């Protein structure tokens, strides 16, 4: 699950395989983990976290979303949920979701009103759901995000153009 590559002597580089002049060796076999040797996340760690997240959100259309508890033996009472609406990458509205009282493997549909913001023509809008721990655990502090999902709310609104005055001359040569 984690890389097993020690630091090279007098270097900030982590070594593996033939870096220690040890032949034969297993090549990069010891650096195929999800976590780097210094216990920082690799890109694979974020992918594994996403795949194993305990809450899935599915867009159903017309402002409705299906929340599913992917846990097999526990409810979601230890989590709280929030959603944010982003306009061109900036949060313009956020709110808490109602209590996540979903038993193992259960689902429920929620509705989020689409009129909470005034949409600007030409802007792009997304909704992001976040699910975080209510309390500290042995492995992470309260507030740690265990699941998230993002959906495009709509294509960016078309800008409104006013017809200009005057004329255009086309000269073909």
Task: Tell me what each language-model feature is.
Residues 63-65, 81, 110, 127, ...:
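Hydrophobic residues positioned within well-ordered beta-strands of beta-sheet architectures
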Residues 71, 133, 157-173:
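Beta-strand-rich N-terminal accessory domains
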Residues 7-8, 95-97, 149:
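Short hydrophobic alpha-helix segments
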Residues 1-62, 72-77, 82-91:
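Extended substrate-binding grooves/exosites of carbohydrate-active enzymes
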Residues 50-60, 152, 156-159, 163-164:
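Extracellular ectodomain segments of secreted/surface proteins
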Residues 89-124, 128-132, 139:
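Intrinsically disordered, low-complexity Pro/Gly/Ser/Thr-rich segments with frequent PxxP/GP/PP motifs
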Residues 48, 67, 129:
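Conserved, mostly hydrophobic/aromatic
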Residues 136-162:
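Short beta-strand elements
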């Amino acid at each position: 699950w984690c890389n097993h590559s020690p630091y090279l002597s007098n270097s900030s580089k982590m070594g593996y395989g033939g870096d220690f002049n040890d032949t034969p060796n297993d090549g990069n076999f010891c650096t195929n983990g999800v976590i780097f040797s210094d216990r920082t996340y690799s890109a694979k760690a974020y992918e594994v976290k996403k795949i194993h997240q305990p809450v899935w959100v599915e867009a159903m259309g017309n402002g409705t979303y299906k929340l599913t508890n992917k846990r097999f033996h526990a409810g979601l009472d230890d989590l709280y949920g929030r959603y944010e609406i982003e306009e061109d990458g900036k949060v313009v509205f956020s709110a808490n979701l109602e209590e996540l009282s979903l038993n193992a493997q259960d689902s429920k549909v929620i509705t989020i009103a689409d009129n909470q913001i005034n949409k600007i023509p030409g802007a792009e809008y997304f909704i992001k759901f976040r699910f975080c721990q209510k309390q500290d655990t042995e492995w992470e502090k309260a507030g740690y995000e265990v699941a998230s999902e993002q959906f495009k709310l709509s294509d960016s609104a078309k800008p409104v153009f006013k017809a200009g005055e005057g004329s255009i001359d086309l000269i073909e040569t």
